[in-house]
Amino acid sequence: MLMYGDFAGMYDPLMKDVDYDSWAEYLLRFLGDEKLRVTDCACGTGEITLRLARAGHIMTGVDISGDMLRIASEKARRAALKIPFVEQDMRKLALHRPQDAIICACDGVNYLDSLKAAEEFFEAANAALKVGGLLLFDISSQYKLENILGCNTFAE
């Protein structure tokens, strides 16, 4: 994950076509209107974290890249949102209190490099959730990775 140090400054321009508003709207359908304590794992530069905070949720952003989190923190500061951003490996979540929900959007789980790493994340997320809490995540399937993305290059 060290690659995100140099990459952090280029991440948002490269991801400009991601529809973060739709992502947030989709997640909000599951989270509902009640103010929840939510942790966004693999939050990157905080785009989804910020949107869910604006919707009224008590957010924490977690990412392994301090450089990505510095950008996320600056965005939150400019938006006058108080969001703690924590540099840690999502496989070893160490949160101060149980969470109502944990999210890991935009293929964050796909960045884990083994089945064991994924299991560690799911176990850590389960331990960090309140009883009955929600874990919301998405993944790109092996079919998508091999047959849709494959060895294709996507560029403008």
How does the language model describe each region?
Residues 42-46:
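Class I SAM-dependent methyltransferase "Motif I" SAM/SAH-binding loop
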Residues 94-101:
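A short acidic, Gly/Pro-enriched loop at the edge of an enzyme's catalytic core
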Residues 47-92:
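Class I SAM-dependent methyltransferase SAM/SAH-binding core
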Residues 1-36, 47, 134-156:
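Conserved class I S-adenosyl-L-methionine
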Residues 105-107:
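Residues lining the SAM
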Residues 119-131:
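A short glycine-rich, Lys/Arg-flanked "PGG" loop and its adjoining helix->strand segment in the class I
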